[in-house]
Structures are given as C-alpha cells and as structure tokens.
Amino acid sequence: VRALVGDLTFLHDVGGLLLGELEDEVDVQVVVADDAGGAIFALLGHEEANPAGFARLFTTPQRADIAALAAGYGAAYRRVTTLDELSRALAEPIRGRSVLHAPVGPRRQEFSRAQALI
C-alpha cells in the first residue's frame, strides 16, 4: 500500500505509523509531498487579500523533522530531492513501514509533477 499525503496531513496523522505489539508488520509507504505547509490552500484564491494572514491560517509553515518522526514510530525513512530519485524510489517494492519524503517546494507545478509520478 502506498499513500500520498502533504506534510501537514502527515504531521496530523503520523500516529498511524505506530504498530501495536500484537500486530504483524505491514507493507505500507507514506509518500510525503512536503511544501513546508498547506500550499494546496492557495487554490482557494484568498492569498492576495491578506498574504500574512493566509500564511499563518492556511499554509501554516512548519519545520518538523519528518525523519525523526518516522524513526520514532519505527518506520524506515528516505528523502528524495529530484524527480528521478522519486521515480526510482517508487519503482522499488514496499517492505515494511516506510516514509518517502519528497520536498516539493511551494509551487503548484512542482507538486503536480511529483503527483503525476505517484
């Protein structure tokens, strides 16, 4: 199983990586498209009216350590910084719990290109 989430969604739901003591290991990979906040909300068209308020209330920039969070829940971690690296990582089989961290920047076109690969 592979799931594509944004960084804010990952931060909200990271506890889902926790595996109970009586549970068998599962093969699941969470691909984190990290735009350092909720850039998807730029699609709402409200940014121009109040850029500072929009950033604080909608994009909510953050500096979370995604690698440390993955490790804390016992999941493997890998960071990819190019579309080629992402493409190669996605071609590999999923074994166990893992987090594939793909910083995509705040620009929608970067996110769209990464999303097309997944």
Where are these regions (language model features)?
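Thiamine diphosphate
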Residues: 1-118
